[in-house]
């Protein structure tokens, strides 16, 4: 199981933009009910995909500039990056298998 990395403006380039692996960024906030409900699903995704991908989280309350830059309007938003570019987005509560399939499509 790979660890889920907290991303900030300071480490975004290193963790996401220049990463060779497919990277998923979970844009979330602590007050968002669906975000909280997705936490165990995201943990299961980490366990299922292991080191094949990099899984990250951005707390939009603490990192509003990242949310604004990527035009995040609805939480949670799962942005799938490949070669530093967003290749897919999933929004809202998403079943594990659907989120896993979306990520695996870019491996």
Language-model segments: residues:
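N-terminal targeting signals for export/organelle localization
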Residues: 1-4, 44, 48, 100
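A short beta-strand-turn-helix
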Residues: 4-23
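Conserved acidic residues
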Residues: 8, 59-61
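CheY-like receiver
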Residues: 14-15, 66, 102
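Conserved helix-turn-beta segment immediately C-terminal to the redox Cys motif
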Residues: 20-22, 39-58
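Conserved redox-active cysteine motifs that mediate thiol-disulfide chemistry
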Residues: 27-41
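Structural micro-motif
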Residues: 64, 70-79
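Non-catalytic, surface beta->alpha helical segment in thiol-disulfide oxidoreductase systems
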Residues: 74, 80-107
């Amino acid at each position: 199981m790979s660890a889920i990395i907290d991303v900030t403006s300071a480490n975004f380039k290193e963790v996401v933009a220049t990463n060779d692996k497919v990277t998923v960024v979970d844009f979330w906030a602590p007050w968002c009910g669906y975000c909280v409900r997705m936490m165990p699903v995201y943990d299961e995704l980490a366990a299922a995909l292991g080191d094949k991908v990099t899984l990250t989280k951005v707390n939009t309350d603490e990192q509003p500039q990242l949310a604004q830059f990527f035009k995040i309007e609805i939480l949670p938003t799962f942005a799938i990056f490949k070669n530093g570019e967003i290749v897919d987005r999933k929004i809202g509560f998403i079943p594990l298998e659907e989120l896993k399939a979306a990520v695996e499509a870019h491996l």
